[in-house]
């Protein structure tokens, strides 16, 4: 996912 989404959804990035 994009880094914009990582900022919005940090838990999904784990």
Swiss-Prot record:
InterPro entries recorded: Emycin-R_leader_pep2
Key words, A-Z: Antibiotic resistance, Leader peptide
One of the GO biological process terms: response to antibiotic
Pfam family, one: Ery_res_leader2
Role description: This peptide is involved in the control mechanism of the synthesis of the macrolide-lincosamide-streptogramin B resistance protein. It acts as a transcriptional attenuator.
Protein name per the record: Erythromycin resistance leader peptide
Source organism of the structure: Bacillus anthracis
